[in-house]
Swiss-Prot record:
HAMAP family: RNase_P_4. GO terms for biological process: tRNA 5'-leader removal. Zn(2+) binds at residues 67, 70, 96, 99. It comes from Thermococcus sibiricus (strain DSM 12597 / MM 739). This is Ribonuclease P protein component 4. Binds 1 zinc ion per subunit. The keyword S-adenosyl-L-methionine does not apply. The keyword Lipid biosynthesis does not apply. Its main location: cytoplasm. GO terms for molecular function: ribonuclease P activity; zinc ion binding.
Amino acid sequence: MSKKFSRRKEQREKKKIALERIDILFNLAERVFAYDKELANRYVEIALAVQQKAKVRMPRKWKRRYCKKCHSFLVPGVNARVRLRQKRMPHVVIKCLECGHIMRYPYLREKKERRKAKKQ
């Protein structure tokens, strides 16, 4: 029994370290992007490799900051176009200006949370 619990604890620790590394790499990519886009893209690739190896989910705040197709770090207004659309379901459209890939993220959940906050 003790081995099983220690293994779980070890896996939890590995995932925690992986998430910290992903966060550090994306913060570095954010800082470096202004003067070296290639290095920022490399940091994103390394973060994706860490995420895959550790089998952890990418945090939401970073998931939307890289292109799913070309893995480049996205900065709105520089190499990404961000638009809000209302057709059918309200969503955010992010277009990568490096490869032309379009990503859509619904924001219905955020709207519902705001409505609940207003009612209370």
